[in-house]
Regions:
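Short amphipathic alpha-helical segments
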Residues: 13, 17, 93, 186-193
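Signal for well-folded cores of large energy- and translation-related assemblies
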Residues: 26, 77, 102, 194, ...
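Conserved nucleotide-sensing/catalytic segment adjacent to the nucleotide-binding pocket
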Residues: 28-85
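Conserved residues at beta->alpha junctions
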Residues: 8, 87-89, 185
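C-terminal accessory "lid"/substrate-recognition subdomains
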Residues: 110-202
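Glycine-rich phosphate-binding P-loop
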Residues: 2-22
């Protein structure tokens, strides 16, 4: 199985662009925030956006729990996936995910700054800060089985000027950990959590 990495800061619009990047690089599936997604189906995993706090969400996204990692490894083994897109906030986070899922190093790494303008990234960050909304690259009807938070699914692309542009392959959600104000966790803190998790994980 081959791996393509997609890296960008938290809230920069990675999940919004994930399906397009996956198609461009001929990826059969996506790993995003603890979920293994193929087409419009979730093959395995648990969404990090279902966690009650941001620290637990980061641990979920890197498959910190052995049972979570094992479930997704088994789902990968049962699948016919040949190339997979892994989404993360840093190269180190990519490495941790591939280690936990026993996947090879990425053939290529795409950075959000390679495919999105500074203005587009700023707009995505502002949307995250203002509304606390997150995008999951899977239809709402499928995600409802795996997510218990608030759904704010819109019938159009919030990043497009064309309100007639439908995005039925994505869901817009508000995780439980974003209900209570706008407490933020920076990418530096995410990196610290990933680093500290090394001590509790056996690759």
């Amino acid at each position: 199985m081959e791996v393509i990495a997609f890296v960008g800061s938290s809230g920069s619009g990675k999940s919004h662009r994930a399906i397009g990047v996956a198609h461009q690089y001929h990826c059969d599936a996506i790993i995003d925030d603890g979920l293994l997604i193929q087409g419009s189906k979730i093959l395995g995993g648990t969404s990090a956006k279902s966690e009650q706090n941001r620290v637990q969400a980061v641990k979920r996204a890197i498959f910190y729990e052995d049972s979570h990692a094992a479930e997704v490894r088994e789902a990968l083994a049962r699948s016919s996936i040949r190339r997979i897109l892994i989404i993360a906030t840093s190269d180190r986070m990519i490495n941790k995910i591939t280690a936990r899922l026993v996947l090879p190093d990425p053939l290529k790494t795409i950075y959000i700054t390679d495919i999105a303008s500074k203005q587009e990234i700023k707009k995505a960050h502002e949307s995250r800060l203002r509304y606390g909304k997150h995008i999951v690259p899977v239809p709402t009807v499928e995600l409802k089985q795996h997510f218990s938070g608030f759904f704010a699914n819109l019938p159009y692309n919030i990043f497009s000027k064309n309100k007639n542009e439908r995005r039925e392959s994505r869901s817009i959600v508000r995780p439980a950990f974003s209900y209570y104000g706008t407490i933020l966790i920076s990418d530096y803190v995410i990196e610290d959590i990933v680093n500290q998790a090394d001590g509790g994980i056996r690759d």
